C-alpha cells in the first residue's frame, strides 16, 4: 500500500512529495484496480495544481479585498481581518481518508453492509474547501455600552455581513453553492434568501463549542470552489486556542476514525487502507520529518514555510 508518510523523510519539497506520491499511488491503483485510490489521486492532483498554477489566486484575492473595502466603508468603527489559505497536504490527506473511514463505518452501522463504489464515490465528491478565506470581526470596547453587550452586538453584525456577502461576491463573478440542508440556520438574523447557502455552526452548537458560518462559492473565472468562514473574534479564539482548537478537534477525529472494532479487518479493503493511512498521519512525530522548508521542535512548536502542515497563506488583511 502506498502511504504519504513514506515520502516525508527525503528532504524533498512539498511539490516533489506530491508528485512522487501521486505517481506511485496511481501506478498501484492501476495495478490493483483500486477505484478509490484513483479518486484519491485526482483529489491530490487538485492540490498540486493549486500550488503549481496559482496565478488566478491573485485575482481571486483581489476580489476578496473588494469586500474588505466594502466592510471598511460600511463598518468604520469595527475591527476585522481577512485570511486566505490553501489547505495543507497533511490536513487534506487526513480529511480524505477520514471521509472514507467515517462514511463506510456509518453506512455499515446503519445498513449492516458496506456501501457500493458508486455511493462511496459520491461521498468523496464534496471537497470544496481546498481554498478558504476567513473573515473575523470584533467591535472595539470603546464602541460598546458594556462588555456584556459584546457577544450579542458582534453576532448581530456577523449575520448582517453574512446577508450581504453572497450578493456582493456574485457581482464579482462567484456563485454561492447550496448547502443542501447541512447545518441549516434557524437564526432570525439570517435572511431567508441566503439561508440555503450557509452552514450555520452558531445555531447548532457542537460539543467543543465550535461556532462559525460557512459558505461555499464557485469562482466562475478560475473554475474552482472556495469556502468562506465568518466568525467573531471570540468564536475564532475558541476555534484556534480554545476548546475547539485543532488539538481538540484532532482528538475528536481520532476517536471517530479509530472505531476499528465495528469493521472486521480484511472485509473492506477501502476501509482498511484509509484507516491505516489516517492513523499513521495522526501518529506522526513532526520533529522527525525531513521536508524542505519545514521544521518542528515537537507537534506544537512548528515552523512551516512550505504549507505541509499549516497550509499556504494566500492573503491577510490588516485589522
What function would you assign to each model-found segment?
Residues 1-317:
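Nucleic-acid processing machinery
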Amino acid at each position: 500500500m502506498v502511504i504519504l508518510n513514506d515520502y516525508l523523510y527525503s528532504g524533498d519539497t512539498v511539490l516533489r512529495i506530491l508528485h512522487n506520491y501521486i505517481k506511485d499511488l496511481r501506478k498501484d491503483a492501476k495495478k490493483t484496480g483500486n477505484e478509490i485510490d484513483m479518486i484519491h489521486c485526482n483529489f491530490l492532483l487538485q492540490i498540486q495544481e493549486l500550488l503549481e498554477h496559482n496565478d488566478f489566486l491573485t485575482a481571486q484575492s483581489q476580489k476578496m479585498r473588494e469586500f474588505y473595502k466594502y466592510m471598511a466603508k460600511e463598518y468604520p468603527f469595527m475591527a476585522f481581518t481577512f485570511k486566505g489559505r490553501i489547505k495543507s497536504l497533511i490536513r487534506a490527506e487526513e480529511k480524505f481518508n477520514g471521509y472514507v473511514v467515517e462514511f463506510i463505518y456509518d453506512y455499515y452501522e446503519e445498513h449492516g453492509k458496506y456501501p457500493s463504489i458508486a455511493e462511496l464515490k459520491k461521498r468523496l465528491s464534496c471537497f470544496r474547501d481546498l481554498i478558504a478565506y476567513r473573515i473575523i470581526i470584533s467591535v472595539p470596547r470603546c464602541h460598546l455600552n458594556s462588555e456584556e453587550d459584546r457577544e450579542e452586538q458582534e453576532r448581530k453584525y456577523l449575520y448582517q455581513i453574512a446577508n450581504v456577502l453572497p450578493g456582493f461576491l456574485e457581482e464579482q463573478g462567484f456563485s454561492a453553492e447550496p448547502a443542501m440542508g447541512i447545518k441549516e440556520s434557524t437564526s432570525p438574523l439570517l435572511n431567508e434568501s441566503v439561508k440555503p447557502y450557509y452552514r450555520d455552526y452558531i445555531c447548532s452548537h457542537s460539543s467543543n463549542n465550535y461556532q462559525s458560518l460557512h459558505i461555499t462559492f464557485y469562482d466562475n473565472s478560475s473554475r474552482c470552489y472556495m469556502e468562506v468562514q465568518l466568525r467573531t473574534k471570540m468564536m475564532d479564539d475558541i476555534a484556534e486556542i480554545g476548546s475547539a482548537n485543532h488539538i481538540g478537534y484532532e482528538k475528536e477525529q481520532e476517536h471517530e476514525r479509530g472505531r476499528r472494532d465495528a469493521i472486521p479487518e480484511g472485509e473492506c479493503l477501502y476501509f482498511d487502507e484509509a484507516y491505516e493511512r489516517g492513523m499513521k498521519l495522526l501518529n506522526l512525530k513532526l520533529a522527525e520529518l525531513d521536508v524542505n522548508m519545514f521544521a518542528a521542535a515537537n507537534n506544537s512548536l512548528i515552523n512551516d514555510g512550505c504549507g505541509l502542515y499549516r497550509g499556504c497563506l494566500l492573503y491577510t488583511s490588516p485589522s
